[in-house]
Swiss-Prot record:
Substrate binds at residues 115, 139, 168, 185-186, 202-204, 217, 277-280. It catalyses: UDP-alpha-D-glucose = UDP-alpha-D-galactose. This is UDP-glucose 4-epimerase. InterPro entries: Epimerase_deHydtase, NAD(P)-bd_dom_sf, UDP_G4E. The active site is at 139 (proton acceptor). It comes from Corynebacterium glutamicum (strain ATCC 13032 / DSM 20300 / JCM 1318 / BCRC 11384 / CCUG 27702 / LMG 3730 / NBRC 12168 / NCIMB 10025 / NRRL B-2784 / 534). Its EC number is 5.1.3.2. One of its GO terms (molecular function) is UDP-glucose 4-epimerase activity. Homodimer. Belongs to the NAD(P)-dependent epimerase/dehydratase family. SUPFAM superfamilies: NAD(P)-binding Rossmann-fold domains (SSF51735).
């Protein structure tokens, strides 16, 4: 298929683009590089630099596109609380612009990068797709709003669509991994201590109702996540909007992640306990049974050591090319 991938220079988007290319698809990427990395763009992909709102109409007007994978979005939870106006514009307005351009040019196949943040603070785990959606921040709220929009476009206009709600994406695929200027994810933050770009890491709360007192999360390997996008694109049905949770189904605590990073890197990695962060749930674990049954998707890299080893191979190879190193310099 001839595909458009928005945000294809980002962490998840670039790996998904690479995997789509490996499966024989023709990939065009739109990215404005507000957070993406040029080095992450697959060599065989066509790149168009620009904002989706500004260029998507012209790109799709070329004709021949058979599907879209939409990653382009703001995705920092804390920032979304401080700047909700920017999130509502950059996430929701952009998605609506894309949906209307797709409709205008007869592109009827969509996979949308949604998030577990749509669920907010769940009362029970594992989280299934039929649980209440109660986002606690603008990031989750904007993604949920886009999910609603996609549902209505599917019903009214016959759009074939899938929303994939990611849990904690981690790991690396070859020379593509997490290398953001503003890092918020646990594993890359901890590994930056091992590379000397940070003095220590923080554990936000050690009094959670979990086995070791630290928060528990479900980590999904980036390659497993990318493969789910391929399966979704190749099985979408007109007039239907499917929603799937994507996680490993296993939970690891912050302490377990820090200790695994110590084992893999051979670095002591000082970890300091800090106060809990408002809005953080004690435990977030996905049920991906629906994706396994309906998509035929099964995560293959669920072991925490494998995820950390892949992330460390990428992080340690970055050296002074990392955002952390550039900022320090």
């Amino acid at each position: 298929m001839k595909l458009l991938v928005t945000g294809g220079a980002g962490y998840v988007g670039s790996v998904a683009a690479a995997v789509l290319l490996e499966h024989g698809h023709d990939v065009t990427i739109i990215d404005n590089f507000s957070t993406g990395n040029r080095e992450a763009v697959p060599a065989d992909a066509r790149l168009i630099e620009g904002d989706v709102n500004d260029v998507v109409e012209e790109v799709l007007s070329e004709g021949g596109f058979e599907g879209v994978v939409h990653f382009a979005a703001r995705s920092l939870v804390g920032e979304s609380v401080e700047k909700p106006n920017e999130y509502w514009h950059d996430n929701v307005v952009t998605a609506l612009t894309l949906l209307d351009a797709m409709r205008a040019h007869g592109v009827n196949n969509l996979v949308f990068s949604s998030t577990a943040a749509t669920y907010g603070e769940p009362d029970v785990v594992p989280i299934t797709e039929d649980m209440p959606t109660q986002p606690t921040n603008a990031y989750g709220a904007t993604k949920l709003s886009i999910d609603y929009a996609i549902t209505s476009y599917a019903a009214a206009f016959g759009l074939a669509a899938t929303s994939l709600r990611y849990f904690n994406v981690a790991g690396a695929y070859g020379n593509i991994g997490e290398n953001r200027e503003v890092e918020t994810h646990l594993i890359p933050l901890v590994l930056q201590v091992a590379t000397g770009h940070r003095e220590k890491t923080f554990m936000f709360g050690d009094d959670w109702p979990t086995p070791d007192g630290t928060a528990v999360r479900d980590y999904i390997h980036i390659l497993d996540l990318a493969k789910a996008h391929v399966l979704a694109l190749e099985s979408n049905e007109a007039g239907k909007h499917r929603i799937f949770n994507l996680g490993s189904g296993d939970g690891y605590s912050v302490k377990q992640v820090v200790e695994m990073c110590r084992e893999v890197t051979g670095h002591p990695i000082p970890a300091e306990v800090a106060p809990r962060r408002a809005g953080d749930p004690a435990t977030l674990i996905a049920s991906s049974e629906k994706a396994k049954q309906e998509l035929g998707w099964t995560p293959e890299h669920t072991d925490l050591r494998t995820i950390v080893e892949d992330a460390w191979a990428f992080t340690s190879a970055l050296g002074d090319r990392s955002h952390a190193a550039k900022k320090k310099a």
